[in-house]
């Protein structure tokens, strides 16, 4: 046996000994080839799961999108209709956030949504409604249109910006909201009698919430001394009438006031001890700054077209109550 052969056998023996020692520390149940195989399988399945997620997600949303449509004019009305019918209908608003319902022109897509709707709920006195309702009847003859202001005593405003001198912001009074909801509920029960019990239960819930909102507002404004306020666009006639306030309007015939009108309103505001000026979010109201500087009144931004009509009414009451502080 030569040196090479001897070293060959020695090296083999040492290798076998090392291999034996390693095997004592390595669990038999974890063979390397099996681990690699499972990893490869996971690499195949994981992308497959990613591909399937949109399918299941799409199925879920397809089910939601298959709800029949109801169209409404403004966001506060969508709040009411969704509370009553949201379980069975998808509710869409014709006037987007930030747009004026007095002058807004619906887009072709919005008019398409209206034509595909089962029902349409209108305030009945908004500027764009007067222009668009007749067109809706022509393009969608099967569409059923309901006016939610039925049964509500409409109030006049100080200028002609609302057409028939009528303030359309009926939802700024919680009591009016109750009547609006009752009108919606009656229409839903007529067209979907199968769910009458649900609609009436939801109506009762909304009535309780409106009553609680009214109670909170009365409590907040009960000790307010200054009962007059300025507002750029006359949107709080129903709120003022309900809670014992008087609104003075800056806007003249739907436009910025003339210098003569400006001077008259400033004089009247000073005499009436006005301490607050409301400015709606969708209006620029360039003259409001002049009124504020001339009268010392604080400017408060409001959004009567907000989805949460209740929060907006309470925020208005808080602003009026803060005059006492």
Question: Model-predicted segments: where are they?
Answer:
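Short hydrophobic transmembrane-like helices used for membrane targeting/insertion
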Residues: 1, 17-18, 42-44, 53
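Low-complexity, intrinsically disordered or signal/transmembrane-proximal segments
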Residues: 3, 9, 20, 25-26
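Intrinsically disordered, low-complexity segments enriched in serine/proline and basic residues
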Residues: 6-8, 15, 33-36
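Bacterial N-terminal signal peptides that target proteins for export
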Residues: 36-47
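Extracytoplasmic metal-acquisition and chelation regions
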Residues: 59-325
